Amino acid sequence: MKYYIVAGEASGDLHASNLIRSIARKDSRAEFRCFGGDLMKAAGGTLVRHYRDLAYMGFWPVISHLGTILSGARMCFDDICEWAPDAVILVDYPGFNLSIAQKVHKKGIPVYYYISPKIWAWKSWRIRKIRRYVDEMFSILPFETDYFSRHNYKVRYVGNPTVDEISKYLSDTKRPQVLTDDGRRIVALLAGSRRQEISRNLPTMLEALEGIDCIRPVLACAPGIEPEFYDSIIGGKEIEKVYGGTYGVLEKAYAALVTSGTATLETALFGVPQVVCYRLPVSWGVKLIRKLLLRVRFISLVNLVSFSEVVPELVAGDMNAVDVREHLMPLLSDTQERRMQLDGYDQMKDLLGPAGAPDRAAEMIIFLLEQRTRQ
């Protein structure tokens, strides 16, 4: 069968590449054509256009490049129509992908969505497009099944691919050791993946660590961010930097300061107690917008999956060096706070379930397509 896959950022490229491999193992005649990235190409997809050509984040960058984004969407749709796939698989990236879903669905091509848009947090009105134009949704967060059910749409939870990535990493007996032990307890710093995010969060993280004895701060640097950018923020502070080795840092870490996102989940799956830190441009307006528009109690995936505050979250004006330090200190020794986080991680892992997310998604997609051909 012919599968057209669309992913719009680095994480989507990774998850889509694993899905391609899973489908290929189960469908020996599978062909793949992609709007995506290098990993999808390496997995066997014919790359039509790279996601970086359309990767604009934030209100003004999107508005100023709207023409490029719209022309990219038209090109994607035209290419889909010309290639005539048996299915279109969309991976996250909802702003772009839901517009593709709308057009493709009208052509009678089945649309499958792997990694649900996070409409439970933001832009819940997108459920209308999902109900109309997405044939099947495959979720990677267990609580999403209840959320979508309340909105009269059934999603299938397939497991979380981060579990797969970490299981694969830990099972590699030849994995490189990026850090050697020197007796000090490593505090991992995961300050975000984008420059704006890093510049807002890293200075406060570094300030919070000043004067704490017997720790070894290690910064896990994001891919695509040049060393000079980090150096401009760190200044003269002696902070170890590791490039391309976040899992290697987490494997050795005793505690961590982490911005929100998948990094919080990765940190928990490695069993590293953490403080979630996320600074926004501080103003009463931002706080008001957050209260009015964000529909969730928590920002970290650990707490969202667990339905409780397993890890402390310091957000916006609450994210300051004093409070970060206050929440970090109990995690640096064998305390009740540390043990409670680790117990919470165990419960979260049970909720996420075992590895195998891309395999389960692939099996369902192939089964659904076979059902269609028999009708």
List PLM regions with ranges:
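Nucleotide-activated sugar donor-binding and catalytic core shared by glycosyltransferases
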Residues: 1-375
